[in-house]
Amino acid sequence: MRSDSSPPAVRSSFARILPAAAAAVTLVLGGTSASAAAPPTTASTTASAMTGTQLAASWTGPLSTRGRYIVDANGDRFKLKAGNWAGAQGTWEGSGDVNDPANNQAGQVSHNIPLGLDRTPLTQILADFHGLGLNSMRLPFANALIHDTSTVPDAAVAANPQLKGKTPLQVYDAVVAALTADGFAVILNNHTTTYRFCCGLDGNERWNSSQSTEQWEADWLFMVQRYRTNKRVVGADLRNEVRRDTWDNPNWGWGDSHDEYAAFEEAGNRILAADPDMLVVMEGINWSGIPTAITWHERPMLTPVRNLSNTLVRSDKLVYAAHFYAYTGPANTGAESGPGSTSDPRYQDFTPEQLAQVVNDEALFVTQSGQHFTAPVWISEFGAAGRGSTNAKEQAWFHNFTDILVKNDTDFAQWPVVGWSDANGNPQDNWALLSYDATGKRLGLGDPGDWRAADWNKLINAPSLTGPVAPVTHWNMLDLDFGDQNVSTRMLAQGDWSNGNRKGNCPDTERLVGLGRGDSRGLCTDAGQPAAGAGDWVTVTDERYVTHGDWAPGYNKLQCPDNTYAVGYSAHSNAMSALLCAPAAAPLPTTGRNAWFDHGDNRPATGGSTASDWAPGYYKGQCADNEYLAGVAYTWKWNHGGVPDALLCRPLS
């Protein structure tokens, strides 16, 4: 979320300075990510619009993923052409009377419900969304909304009297119901903890800022269960713009209370247990470090996913997200001057070619097919100041950035869709695509004077993949660096199968095909997956199933029984402890080959996730896509420490 501070690009919270003990400055952080550069494109001069009836008939919920694409229940591409309808996260900027427009973003007092309901009937707002060519809506909320029992002022819903006397959550319910009834897909977005306009040091920096992780998860389960029967509520966007607080950075995979990777994965799997139909949207780290000329600072976005991606119990439910704004940069907070301002380049400073490369490096690389990290990338926030803006660099950036989205056929959500106009008809927030004055009169993107219209229509009307998307093969990594990674629904429902050891379990539809040597990481796939057989899964801790000759003389071996394949493993420190083996429905070959990786990587020349590193800094062994992992050899000799040295790979047929 960006601020309305003057100039438009600068967030007001940069005025605050971190305590001297933190040796820092306030962090205000904008969006993240795009893709490769595109040549100028041409498109219709108006957005392609559907009626609610047409939009509802064009897709069927729930949504899932196939590789880099989101698809509907029929397997047809559903490209998110979305907007952000802000307000329910709060517009108060943190000081003074919460009801004073001067203390709210752009003078807009949302009363903690989506903006515009005081001045325009809900049906008209939705019709205007259709006119923009949107098919989906990111709907921010604060955790405070869930627990708020107060009723909104009548004036806050003056144009929608049916909403009088309702709590903010009940108004949110009504908005969700209206959106989905009119054909829109809705993605719930946990934007803030408290009612507060993001960002900076506002007490909302992480999922567990101003609340516990347990409360955050409980709130998500409440929201998911609340809308579970509405299959047009398609996704849970876990948290907005995770960033540094006064004292510490968020991280990706460190195993502590600030570990976004672990927190998001746990929450995502709990959400899928409550509603297996939901998409789980994970935005990368928006900011780390202290922005000065002498201290480290950066905007990581999705870059950590390259070597440490998330694995959910459902491999077809993960979507990654990123935010991009012209005035921010890979290491630039967006501050114009004073605290937080550095000389690092902004996204608007890059040439089209440079911007395309940066956006790819920070986000769109995730869409590369056949890797452990492959998933759709949703640019869930981007935007620019429109009517009245004279910022040539931002305008050039917007043109170049939308070209990138077009070229890469990228899912997107503009920030924000709805704002207010003042008594003179001027937008109070000129980033909004639609502005309504106190009488309900609309000033929209399609009205004369908004320079963004051509690029918006280019984006909305751009050629895209449509129709059926072919099923894809999945590769997913397991990370036992700091504890178990159990993404098997079956095993989650059972007891501890390797007590006292760290355990990794593949999703129920996948098998284990690779291990890292010394870091306890693993790789799963469903490539050529054999049909699952009946019977118990077997925990193997010794050599009792080595029945077709000693395939690794002098080494300890863990080998699955005949006609079973490895689906999990356990380790103590980094030494092998056990294999978990699942039965196949039909007999499996018992001949195979050894894949030794004690002196270097031994991975297929082609095939799954071979172009990406799921265990950086360690040797990796990996069976081919048409093989199953039947055994692991290890030794305590020669200071090997019991880490895996070889895999027994057998053909699937």
Name each model feature, range by range:
Residues 1-42:
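Secretory targeting and sorting signals
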Residues 38-39, 47-136:
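N-terminal carbohydrate-binding accessory modules
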Residues 107-114, 118, 208-210, 214-235, ...:
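Extracellular glycoside hydrolase catalytic/binding regions
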